[in-house]
Amino acid sequence: MNVPQIVKDANKKSDYIVFWLSVIICITIIIATVSLGFIAALYAAHEIDENGFSQFESFFTQNIIFLLTGIAGFMLLLVSIRIMRQTYLGNALQVEYSDCVWLRNWSNKVAKDLEMPEVEIMVTQDPVMNAFAFGFMKPYTIVLNSGLIRYATDDELKAIIVHEMAHIKYGHTKMGTYSSIFRFMPGLGSVFSWILDFWGRRSEFTADRLALAYLKSKEQVKRALVCVHIGPDMAKSFNDLAQQWQVYKTDSSFNRFSQTFSSHPFLVLRLQRIDNSNLINDTLPKISESNDKNNTKTEDVKYGSDS
């Protein structure tokens, strides 16, 4: 079966180019750092430190520690991700055992439409309105904070679920996990994080595009983003005029540079990208609704309810 057209339309090959370019830059920095240290150690090979080691011997000792620390951190991360899932299984609530069982039905439908593995959805006690996906192998997991369940509307939750599932569909969670070995490198971790976040911000735009292409409703996706970022109460005040003014204020070289220190794009820029998107048009093929015939779902999980 061919990959659904909307998945191709929402994705950008340049995302993968930026990711691998970021990885290559990180590797280049490591090689350059080690090479410079090696050269310096050669010039100072005759000098003895307070422990009785030559600078050359100290150099190799430090770099072995550097390498082992990075590898140990990466392996610890892989294990901690699996532990995290088990922790959520023990302490969080799976939506199929709650009043939010419709979220599981919705995610299963999205997974079938997008031809991807079904995901686990868990709710954890946290008043902050947030959601995230994690996992580098099946089963993948989406965690919703209880604050999101309490304040977000059903349509906003649908958009959030599709956004998080996009990260899994496009391999963002897997790529982020594997590239995190650079974030654990002592001394250079913060620099590598800054470099990798260029790809991370692009992945957020891509997930927004897939949510838009799937739901075919700009307002639904925008409301979900605004709700998560500033809350449902203030979201009512975030009208088009306020959005335009904030875009104007953030459209400067300094503000664009400031954004490079954020793991996510500015909210106003995400909303602007959605407004300017041409993904919703008459030529875009719709997902077949024939899959619904064999599903026992409530009216709440019908595809494209806002469109």
For the regions a protein language model found, what residue spans apply to each?
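Hydrophobic or amphipathic, alpha-helical segments that drive membrane association/targeting
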Residues: 1-128, 288-307
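Short helix/loop segments within enzyme catalytic domains
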Residues: 97-118, 193-250, 279-282, 287-292
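Residue-level signature of catalytic and energy-coupling elements of molecular machines
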Residues: 107, 144, 207, 225, ...
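Active-site scaffold of zinc-dependent metalloenzymes
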Residues: 113, 128-153
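Short alpha-helix carrying the canonical HExxH Zn2+-binding catalytic motif
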Residues: 143, 153-170
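Catalytic Zn2+-binding segment of zinc metalloproteases
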Residues: 165-181, 218-219
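Hydrophobic, aromatic-rich membrane-embedded alpha-helical segments
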Residues: 177-196
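Pan-zinc metallopeptidase signature
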Residues: 244-307
